[in-house]
Amino acid sequence: MDLHQLYLDRLRQRDRIEGNFCYLFEAAVVLETAQPPQDSRDLVAKSLREELHAHEQEIHKLKDIVHLRSKDAEKLNDEIISLNIENSLLQDKLTALQAEYDKLIQRWLAKAQSEADAMNQGLA
């Protein structure tokens, strides 16, 4: 009987060990069923990465636009400066021509006055 009892004890021990293995394999099955949320997280992460990439491209385009506009603004400022210089030179030239014109008018008036005075003396 001892052998029979020993055999039964060993079978029970084996069943307990296999039962423990069964719990381990159930956990593995649970992990496999838990993977679809991981897949959805992967999909969310992928869509977020794509959105981030799209935003980075948009930022790059906007930086290019800002750079281009700053160059345009710089060119326009240079144009304004050159036009201001040209305007200043033309204003100086206008002032000089007006002064010369005033001198010519004064000389013409003086000449006309002297001719009028000479005619008046000739008549008197």
From Swiss-Prot:
Top-rank lineage group of the source organism: Eukaryota
Family matches, as InterPro entries: Autophagy-rel_prot_16_dom (IPR013923)
Keyword entries, A-Z: Autophagy, Coiled coil, Membrane, Protein transport, Transport
Quaternary structure note: Homodimer. Part of the ATG5-ATG12/ATG16 complex. Several units of each may be present in this complex.
Chain coiled-coil ranges: 42-107
Protein name: Autophagy protein 16
Function field: Stabilizes the ATG5-ATG12 conjugate which is necessary for autophagy. The ATG5-ATG12/ATG16 complex is required for efficient promotion of ATG8-conjugation to phosphatidylethanolamine and ATG8 localization to the pre-autophagosomal structure (PAS). Also recruits ATG3 to the PAS. Involved in endoplasmic reticulum-specific autophagic process and is essential for the survival of cells subjected to severe ER stress.
UniProt topology in membrane: Peripheral membrane protein
GO molecular function: Atg8-family ligase activity; identical protein binding; protein-macromolecule adaptor activity
Gene Ontology CC annotations of this record: Atg12-Atg5-Atg16 complex; phagophore; phagophore assembly site membrane; vacuole-isolation membrane contact site
GO terms classed as biological process: autophagosome organization; autophagy of mitochondrion; cytoplasm to vacuole targeting by the Cvt pathway; piecemeal microautophagy of the nucleus
Localisation: Preautophagosomal structure membrane
Statement: the UniProt record of this protein carries the keyword rRNA processing: no
Family: Belongs to the ATG16 family.
Main localization category: membrane
